[in-house]
């Protein structure tokens, strides 16, 4: 089971509208979602209980128990979850967790669904409403799944912990584990939304668009879930998106030092208290790290020369040269050191 990547911002609300209509047709029999208000009370209790139990195991750092209660495919490749439990145990231990109303997803059919889309709750003429949600999961085997989201508050940064659960016999077994901070560089989604709007008002659309993207990431506990709030932010981000940035799979060229750089991605990245901007570009070979460093540095300077507004919004710039094989070489320069 893979979690789907996000749709392009401009597409989301449009496909929601026709997907609502499509739900009335044959595909509704393949993918059905029940929100907490719609599901049987015993099912809701079971999902909430499983979420609390797995959170307690996570707080104790009991990866062995979590693995024991996982579905076979997850247990067979458990290293990622084990690492996530270890990384977040200190934040979970002694913290208070509140379970949000869960969701029940039913996928029917004889084989895995290449792209399963679940519409949960009530939708209006314009798409999502206050209590609705959409989940998009790739390669999902037929079965009953629960989504239990916990808000975790302790001495550290607020977090969410999301469990995807699969009904197996009398158990709701672990099928996915997603721990996520509710803040980036010490700020929550509301802070990034306000600053994005401020940048937009100053016609700094590159900063606005990148801050909207961070706000969207912080507004949903998992990337394969969207809500009315994230849909509205996608619309705002689309309105601010500049034409000269790589987005939606489209590369953009930037000239620096007589070389043409094919930029493939640009995105914000929080590292500790710093908030950086990362730019990736195509490279034939990164084995010569001295040359790669020089080219990364030249690109960083050219990027700031073209978009000086980035200095107002970020603590540093990361350039990553990426080979066709996926191997890359990155360089981070603090903003104050870039002349």
Regions found by a protein language model. Give the residues of each.
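Surface-exposed, charged secondary-structure patches
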Residues: 79, 85-156, 186, 244-287
């Amino acid at each position: 089971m893979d979690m789907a990547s996000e749709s392009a911002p401009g597409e989301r609300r449009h496909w929601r509208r026709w997907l609502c209509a499509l739900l009335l047709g044959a595909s509704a029999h393949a993918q059905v979602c029940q929100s907490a208000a719609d599901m049987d009370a015993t099912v809701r209790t079971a999902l909430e209980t499983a979420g609390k139990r797995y959170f307690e195991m996570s707080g104790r750092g009991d990866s062995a128990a979590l693995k024991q209660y996982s579905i076979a495919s997850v247990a067979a490749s458990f290293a990622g979850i084990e690492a996530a439990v270890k990384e977040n145990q200190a934040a979970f231990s002694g913290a208070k967790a509140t379970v949000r109303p869960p969701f029940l997803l039913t996928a029917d059919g004889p084989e895995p669904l290449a792209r399963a889309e679940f519409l949960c709750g009530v939708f209006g003429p314009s798409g999502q409403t206050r209590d609705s949600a959409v989940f998009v999961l790739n390669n999902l085997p037929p079965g009953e799944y629960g989504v239990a989201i916990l808000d975790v508050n302790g001495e550290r940064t607020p977090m969410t912990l999301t469990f995807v659960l699969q009904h197996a016999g009398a158990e709701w077994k672990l099928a996915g584990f997603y721990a996520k901070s509710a803040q980036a560089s010490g700020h929550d989604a509301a802070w990034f939304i306000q600053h994005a709007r401020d940048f937009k008002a100053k016609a700094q659309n590159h900063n606005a668009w990148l801050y909207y993207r961070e706000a969207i990431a912080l507004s949903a506990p998992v990337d394969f879930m969207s809500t009315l709030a994230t849909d509205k932010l996608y619309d705002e981000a689309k309105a601010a998106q500049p034409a000269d940035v790589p987005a939606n799979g489209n590369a953009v060229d930037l000239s620096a030092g007589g070389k043409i750089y094919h930029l493939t991605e640009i995105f914000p990245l929080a590292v500790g208290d710093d908030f950086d901007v990362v730019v990736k570009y195509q490279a034939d070979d990164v084995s010569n790290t001295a040359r790669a460093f020089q080219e990364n540095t030249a690109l960083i300077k050219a990027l700031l020369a073209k978009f000086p507004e980035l200095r107002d919004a970020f603590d540093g710039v990361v350039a990553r040269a990426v080979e066709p094989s996926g191997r890359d070489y990155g360089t981070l320069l603090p903003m104050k050191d870039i002349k």
